[in-house]
Structure formats: structure tokens, C-alpha cells
């Protein structure tokens, strides 16, 4: 896993004990390397609200389909990470930090952090704006 300053990946991503999370299209064995905290539930198949979702996408089309689906499942304080291939990875993609951010902002979320998810994937973290969290809670 890529890292900086020795910070564990799970801490960089903000996954905490008791979280209900989704890892969407994650690379094989990705979850095994996260060293998840206790009581974290990886949840893809049910419709339970998510504290954390990480979408691995290679195309703008994938992102425009997946972003609203997982935004709708977030808790008011939840976070949605979008991960796309780094330019240096050699993976073919039409995504960049700019268009990932544009799609997220258009969906009503705000980006608050960027990091290397691993040697291939970059990640951008989105959350609901503070003033929107009460509205999300009531939906």
C-alpha cells in the first residue's frame, strides 16, 4: 500500500471502528491489506446506510453512474472516496482529478482530501457540506 509519513492506509482513508463500508470494484485482496478496525462491516449487497464508500472507477461513465448511487446511501457524516488510475499506472482511463472533482461537486458534495490509495490508484474524498447534513438526515 502506498503511504506517507508512515500513516496506515485505513487511517488515511478515515475508516473507524463500527463503520458500515462499501468497497466497490476494489482490486483483488484490497480489503485484506487494510487492517480494518473492529466491528467494521463490508457491505455491498444490502441497502443499509454507509459511513464510508470507496469507488474504484476507470471511466467517467462508470463514475457518473456510481457516484449518485453511493451518495444516496451515505449517512449525513459519511464519506465517499473516488479512486481512479494514476497517469503513471499505465491503466487506460479518461479520468483525472479535475473531472472527478467536477462530478462530485455537481452531485452536491465537497472534496476535502486527496491521497494515493496505492501504487496504481489516486483517491479523492467527498463529504456532504455541513449545511446539507441536516437535510440528508431527514431524507
Predicted regions and their residues:
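N-terminal, charge-rich interaction modules
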Residues: 1-36
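Mid-chain, well-packed structural core segment of small domains
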Residues: 64-96
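Short acidic low-complexity segments
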Residues: 40-50
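Class I S-adenosyl-L-methionine
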Residues: 108-139
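Conserved Class I S-adenosyl-L-methionine
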Residues: 94-115
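Glycine-rich, highly charged phosphate/nucleotide-binding loops
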Residues: 36-42, 61-69
Amino acid at each position: 500500500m502506498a503511504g506517507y509519513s508512515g500513516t496506515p492506509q485505513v487511517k488515511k482513508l478515515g475508516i473507524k471502528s463500527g463503520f458500515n463500508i462499501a468497497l466497490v470494484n476494489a482490486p483483488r485482496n484490497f480489503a485484506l491489506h487494510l487492517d480494518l478496525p473492529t466491528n467494521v462491516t463490508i457491505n455491498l449487497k444490502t441497502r443499509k446506510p454507509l459511513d464510508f464508500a470507496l469507488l474504484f472507477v476507470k471511466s467517467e461513465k462508470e463514475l457518473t453512474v456510481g457516484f449518485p448511487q453511493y451518495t444516496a446511501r451515505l449517512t449525513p457524516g459519511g464519506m465517499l472516496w473516488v479512486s481512479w488510475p494514476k497517469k503513471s499506472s499505465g491503466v487506460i482511463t479518461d479520468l483525472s482529478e479535475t473531472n472527478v472533482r467536477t462530478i462530485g461537486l455537481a452531485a452536491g458534495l465537497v472534496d476535502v482530501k486527496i491521497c494515493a490509495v496505492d501504487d496504481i490508484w489516486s483517491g479523492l474524498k467527498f463529504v456532504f457540506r455541513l449545511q446539507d447534513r441536516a437535510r440528508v438526515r431527514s431524507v
